[in-house]
Amino acid sequence: QCYKPLWKKSDDPLYKNAIHYLRHRNIGPIDILRYSIGFCSSNGYANRIIIPSYDADGKLNYFMARDMFPNSKFKYKNPPMSKDTVGFEMFINWKEPIVLVEGVFDAIAVRNNVIPLLGKFPSKTLVMRLVEKQVKTIYVALDEDAKQDAIKLSKFLMDYGISTYLLNMRDKDPSELGFKPFWKILKETKQSKFSDIIKGRLHA
C-alpha cells in the first residue's frame, strides 16, 4: 500500500533520494519504467526502493525492497512471499539463451533475457521451467565472491544437458560492470566442459 511509482514525479522528500540512489547504480528513466520501480516512505518498507517481479501472466510473484540510504543496518528486507519463483519471468524468452545472475540490480544491468536467482542457486520452480521449456543454453554470471557456487551451478545445469557458459566476472558483479562490458565478456566466453568445472573446483 505504501508503494509509489518512481516514473511519476512526486513531492515526497524521498522521491529525490530514490532517484539519486538509482542514478548512482546506473539505473535511468527507461529502466525505472520497464521494471515498474517505485519506493516506499511509510509502513514496514519506509526508505526503500521497491523492484517488483512479475510472472509470465503479468502477476506479481515477488518484490525486492532495498534501503536507499548507505548507513542502513538492513540493506534488504524480504517480503512475506516465497522465493520459489522465477524472477522477471515476464521478460523471458525461453527459446533464446538465458543469463542467470544473483540479484535484481545485476539483472537490470544485463537487461536481455536475464533471470535474477534471488540467491546463488535456482529455485525448484525455475529448474522445472528450464526443463519444461527445454532451454538449450545458459550463461552463469554470479557475483565474484560466489565462484564455488557458480561452479556448482554450472555442473548442475550441465547434468541436465544444458550448454553452459561460466563467465569470468573479473572481480566485479554484473551491476558493477554495466551493460556493454558485461556483454563483451559474455561474447568472449567459451562453452564450459566437465573438465573445466573440475579444474575450477580445484583452483577456485
Each PLM stretch: what is its role?
Residues S163-D173:
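A generic structural motif
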Residues A109-V110, T125, D149-K152, P174:
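Phosphate- and divalent-cation-binding pockets in alpha/beta enzyme and binding domains
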Residues D149-G161:
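Short, aromatic/basic amphipathic alpha-helical patches
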Residues Q1-I50, Y54-D57, I92-N93, M128-V131, ...:
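TOPRIM metal-binding catalytic domain and adjacent DNA-binding surface shared by DnaG-type primases
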Residues L100, K136-D149:
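Acidic beta-strand-to-loop metal/phosphate-binding motif
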Residues L118-K124, L142-D145, M169-D171:
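Short, acidic/turn-prone active-site loops that include or flank metal/cofactor-
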Residues S41-T137:
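Phosphate-handling DNA/RNA-contact segment within nucleic-acid enzymes
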Residues R48-I49, V131-V135, S175-E188:
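Short, surface-exposed amphipathic charged segments that create phosphate/polyanion-binding patches used
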